[in-house]
A protein has these predicted regions:
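Basic, helix-initiating cap at the start of DNA-binding domains
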Residues: 1-41, 58-61
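C-terminal peripheral helix-coil segments that are non-catalytic and often amphipathic
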Residues: 2-3, 130-138, 163, 167-205
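Short hydrophobic/aromatic patch on the recognition helix
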Residues: 43-53
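Alpha-helical DNA-contacting segments of helix-turn-helix folds
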Residues: 53, 57-67
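Hydrophobic alpha-helical connector segments
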Residues: 62, 73-101, 113-115
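Amphipathic alpha-helical packing segments from all-alpha helical-bundle domains
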Residues: 89, 112-163
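Short linear capping/connector segments at secondary-structure termini
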Residues: 106-115, 196-197
Length: 205
């Protein structure tokens, strides 16, 4: 029979999770935030931070890894019969992880972490490329450009939109979905029809 984790171990795990959440939130708005700022946001001491992370770069790599794990899981588990619905649903679910998206994107602006970010997000990028190819081949997505280029435009547009701090209204997820659908060739009327016919696009997980 496995013994339960002792209180100190549980506290250490809770502190680590608190630090990662705080780092994600702080770095989403301030990519140059210090360890002191992150520790303060987590309600912990600087010493507690160093007890889990050797330095600021180590913590930033952990933030990238934690975010990528969620993003890649979303990519792998979002699969509808209509590629337009799949893309819209994926955009909705990623928007709900906007803080993690912004933190990872901000960290990636630092060349020292660009390679880490690219590698961590490779599964998500591959999923978008495969989905785009399916959408183009089926006629669901625009066919006036190579699928590889369209996938790149989807990725870059989604990243820019998800990082937009001014999207704070209750229907911000709808805005994100409409922006992405417009990139793949849907008119605003077609977007409205698709959203109306597929309420699952905005369903909670």
């Amino acid at each position: 029979m496995t013994a339960p984790n002792p209180p100190r171990r549980r506290d250490a795990l809770a502190n680590r999770e608190a630090m990662l959440r705080a780092a994600q939130s702080v770095l989403a708005s301030n990519p140059t935030a210090s360890l002191d700022a992150i520790a303060q946001a987590a309600g912990l001491t600087r010493r507690a931070v160093y007890g889990h992370f050797a330095d600021r770069d180590t913590l930033r790599r952990e933030v990238i890894a934690a975010g990528a794990q969620r993003f890649n899981a979303i990519a792998e588990t979002t699969d509808e019969s209509d590629p337009r619905v799949t893309l819209a649903r994926m955009a909705t679910r990623l928007w709900r992880e906007a803080s993690a998206v912004r933190a990872s994107a901000n960290i990636a602006l630092d060349d020292a972490h660009l390679t880490d970010t690219v590698l961590a997000l490779a599964p998500l990028r591959h999923r978008i490329r495969d989905l785009t190819r399916t959408g183009v081949d089926s006629g669901a997505f625009r066919g006036d450009m190579p699928a590889e280029l369209l996938a790149f435009l989807i990725e870059e547009t989604a990243r820019a939109t998800l990082r937009e701090l001014r999207l704070t209204t209750a229907d911000a997820d709808s805005t994100v979905v409409r922006v992405v659908l417009s990139i793949v060739g849907l008119s605003w009327r077609e977007q409205a029809e698709l959203i109306s016919a597929h309420p699952e696009i905005f369903a909670q997980d």
